[in-house]
């Protein structure tokens, strides 16, 4: 893992140098471009308080965050809209903590590589406070398939690692960054934040980690004396926009399953851009989940009772109910969502919250009266509450987190994770097309009402 970390760090240094050179090439009037290098050792604590972590005893994650940062010189519209944020390329090495007892599973180490952005909250000569948002791929050394005991019956045994299900995971990080300049070139700093790492049920198990952390470190800024004259950009020329997206992926339902199940979705929505960097609107979502099937050991998708020749059979595991079949309609769900978009140039962050209006699978779940086992609970309302608590079942509402990147004109590539409460259902990848409608003040004869993104649209 140390060799991997060093290799990734070397690649990151090279990439940072190339980006700095590209920025210089795009600004020929300056032969230099400011950038910074930082290192922040950190230590944290796990928020997860469940049987998967209790067996490890008192363990704490620790490691180091490193980054290569590029302060804004206001040469692009999105930088002006967001108050000149700092962007960076980061790499983190994490020791997840190893218990002292020899018969307890090992958590191992991890490495994450990610872009990040620092949004200014306070900016003075002697102190800066910024909000950090980061996300990218993370890699771990220890998971379910690196251990000898892979028997699902031993899932909760102390010697079994159930935190990660595969090497590749999604890494998310958010926090508050504090910076105290000492000289023009050197600053001391601290950072306090939250780390999440999991695979979004691409593999099982998918417990993942959730950790708070604190860190202190140092930042060295090169070419800090370079100053550029800010460019004044016009506002975004469009207000309303229609988004149409199709996406698909695959996920695992239970550890014992030998295959993954297809998932797919379709989204159509309208967003109004309240500001140059934020839009809000409503959307229609249709989801297909092939894991609603008899070919899984996950009892979450299982008909509670079924009648065979007049005999009521109690289904406790879907793998034993081969006579039960599921229709296409039971694999489909539809919902209406509140869509939020946060624009960072060609990249847009997505935060959606939706509620199902068509959700037949809510009648499938095993959910018996505590005092009258065997009697199925009556059909649920659309807005039902699980008596077993969060995570025991899926919810009547959903959250979708992700990002889309414009690749050409109004065409974009998208990656999103769909969750029920704090439990991930799947990660999907897709393509979409945005139709932005020009504001009346920006329309001209012969150009129509639809805006088309071009590299330097503000110069036209």
PLM region spans:
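Transmembrane beta-strands of outer-membrane beta-barrel proteins
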Residues: 35-39, 85-89, 129-135, 188-190, ...
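Extracellular/periplasm-exposed beta-strand and loop segments of Gram-negative cell-envelope proteins
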Residues: 97-107, 141-151, 157-167, 203-207, ...
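Transmembrane beta-strands of outer-membrane beta-barrel pores
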Residues: 41-47, 70, 91-97, 135-143, ...
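Residues on the lipid-exposed face of transmembrane beta-strands in outer-membrane beta-barrel proteins
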Residues: 39, 64-72, 113-121, 133-137, ...
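Repeated loop/turn-to-beta-strand initiation elements of outer-membrane beta-barrel proteins
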Residues: 75-77, 180-188, 224-227, 276-280, ...
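Surface-exposed strand-loop-strand hairpins of Gram-negative outer-membrane beta-barrel proteins
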Residues: 45-63, 100-107, 250-269
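Outer-membrane beta-barrel "beta-signal"
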Residues: 210-229, 424-460
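Residues that define the transmembrane beta-barrel architecture of outer-membrane proteins
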Residues: 33, 58-64, 83, 105-113, ...
């Amino acid at each position: 893992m140390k060799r991997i970390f060093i290799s990734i760090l070397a690649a990151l240094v090279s990439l940072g140098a190339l980006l700095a050179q590209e920025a210089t090439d795009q600004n020929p009037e300056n032969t230099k471009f400011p950038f910074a290098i930082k290192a922040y050792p950190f230590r944290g604590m796990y928020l997860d308080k469940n049987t998967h972590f209790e067996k490890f005893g008192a363990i704490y994650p620790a490691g180091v965050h490193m980054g290569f940062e590029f302060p804004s010189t206001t040469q692009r519209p999105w930088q002006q809209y967001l108050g000149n944020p700092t962007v960076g390329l980061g790499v983190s090495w994490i020791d997840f903590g190893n218990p002292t007892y020899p018969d307890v599973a090992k958590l191992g180490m991890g490495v994450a590589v990610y872009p990040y952005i620092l949004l200014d909250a306070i900016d003075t000569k002697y102190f800066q406070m910024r909000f950090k948002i980061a996300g990218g791929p993370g890699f771990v050394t220890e998971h379910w398939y690196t251990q000898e005991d892979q028997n699902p019956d031993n899932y909760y045994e102390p010697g079994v690692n159930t935190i990660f299900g595969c090497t590749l995971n999604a890494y998310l990080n958010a926090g508050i960054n504090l910076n105290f300049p000492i000289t023009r070139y050197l600053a001391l700093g601290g950072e306090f934040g939250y780390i999440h790492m999991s695979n979004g049920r691409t593999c099982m198990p998918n417990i993942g980690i959730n950790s708070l952390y604190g860190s202190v470190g140092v930042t060295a800024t090169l070419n800090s004396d370079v100053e550029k004259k800010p460019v004044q950009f016009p506002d975004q020329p469009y207000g309303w926009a229609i988004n149409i997206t199709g996406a698909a992926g695959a996920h695992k339902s239970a550890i014992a399953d030998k295959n993954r199940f297809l998932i797919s979705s379709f989204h159509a929505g309208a967003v109004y851009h309240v500001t140059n960097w934020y839009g809000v609107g409503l959307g229609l979502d249709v989801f297909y989940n092939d894991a609603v099937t008899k070919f899984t050991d996950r009892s979450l998708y299982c008909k509670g009772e079924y009648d065979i020749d007049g005999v009521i059979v109690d289904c406790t595991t879907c793998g034993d109910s081969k006579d039960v079949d599921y229709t296409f309609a039971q694999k489909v769900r539809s919902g209406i969502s509140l869509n939020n978009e946060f624009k960072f140039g060609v990249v847009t962050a997505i935060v959606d919250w939706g509620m199902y209006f068509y959700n037949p699978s809510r009648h499938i779940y095993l959910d018996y009266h505590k005092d009258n086992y065997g009697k199925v609970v009556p059909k649920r309302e659309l807005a039902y509450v699980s008596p077993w608590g969060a995570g025991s079942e899926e919810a009547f509402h959903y959250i979708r987190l992700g990002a889309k990147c414009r690749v050409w004109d109004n065409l974009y590539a998208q990656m999103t994770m769909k969750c029920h409460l704090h439990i991930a259902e799947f990660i999907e990848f897709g393509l979409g097309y945005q139709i932005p409608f020009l504001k009346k003040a920006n329309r001209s004869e012969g150009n129509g009402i639809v805006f088309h993104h071009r590299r330097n649209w503000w110069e036209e």
